[in-house]
Amino acid sequence: MATCSICGKRAVTGNQVSHSNIKTKRTWAPNLQRVKLLVNGTPRRAYVCTRCLRSGKVQRAI
């Protein structure tokens, strides 16, 4: 299961409920992007959620 390397966000599980109220298990996955980051001055690839990218918690390598 993929996890955001910054905030630790991961997929959550719950029920998918049909119109006839039949419940089946399903997962909601975070929107993860594989980006190149600067970690201690060296570029590294990591999976980061889009919330961390938008909020500026990540310094991207170019």
From Swiss-Prot:
Keywords for the protein's UniProt record, in alphabetical order: Ribonucleoprotein, Ribosomal protein
Keyword Zinc: no
Gene Ontology biological process terms, A to Z: translation
Gene Ontology CC terms, in alphabetical order: ribonucleoprotein complex; ribosome
One Gene Ontology term of the molecular function aspect: structural constituent of ribosome
UniProt keyword Ribonucleoprotein, yes or no: yes
Gene3D superfamilies found in the cross-reference section: Ribosomal protein L28/L24
NCBIfam families, per database record: L28 (TIGR00009)
Protein's recorded name: Large ribosomal subunit protein bL28
